[in-house]
Amino acid sequence: MSEAIIAKKAEQVELIAEKMKAAASIVVVDSRGLTVEQDTNLRRSLRESDVEFKVIKNSILIRAAEKAGLEDLKELFVGPSAVAFSNEDVIAPAKVISDFAKDAEALEIKGGSVDGKFTSVEEINALAKLPNKEGMLSMLLSVLQAPVRNVAYAVKAVAEKDEEVA
């Protein structure tokens, strides 16, 4: 192999390793068998959720996983592999890919990583069932507002009772 090719591959490994280190979550899939239309729709859905999706050679993925300290991921890089990276939303790649896989039987989830920890297919599917960040924040806000709302109702009830007595 020429020096230029080796240097280019080393640069790719470095770039992918940095993406792996920075990612909040990574989902590895086998997208073999998807139609062009399905692949385009999947990529569009992932892009709308700020998820980066790439098909990368396994040899580069294996070296990048080693460099990023994610050795457990190496077992997933067998056969055709595509990788979804999300730097912000932990749930987005799992949710988009899991939802898409329900309609596209050819899409197979292999596994992934969440915050640097290996994640099985079952864990990714469970993660996909969780609400997204905005949904979780609204649930938290509802829980935090409930006691204040109850106090307000109690004060209002006492005030109405005092008006009836007066």
Curated annotation (Swiss-Prot):
Pfam families: Ribosomal_L10. Keywords: Ribonucleoprotein, Ribosomal protein, RNA-binding, rRNA-binding. GO terms for molecular function: large ribosomal subunit rRNA binding; structural constituent of ribosome. InterPro entries: Ribosomal_uL10, Ribosomal_uL10-like_sf, Ribosomal_uL10_bac, Ribosomal_uL10_bac_type, Ribosomal_uL10_CS_bac. GO terms for cellular component: large ribosomal subunit. One of its GO terms (biological process) is translation. It comes from the Bacteria. Gene3D superfamilies: 3.30.70.1730. Part of the ribosomal stalk of the 50S ribosomal subunit. The N-terminus interacts with L11 and the large rRNA to form the base of the stalk. The C-terminus forms an elongated spine to which L12 dimers bind in a sequential fashion forming a multimeric L10(L12)X complex. HAMAP family: Ribosomal_uL10. Belongs to the universal ribosomal protein uL10 family. NCBIfam families: PRK00099.1-1. Forms part of the ribosomal stalk, playing a central role in the interaction of the ribosome with GTP-bound translation factors. This is Large ribosomal subunit protein uL10. The lineage of its organism: Bacteria, Bacillati, Bacillota, Bacilli, Lactobacillales.
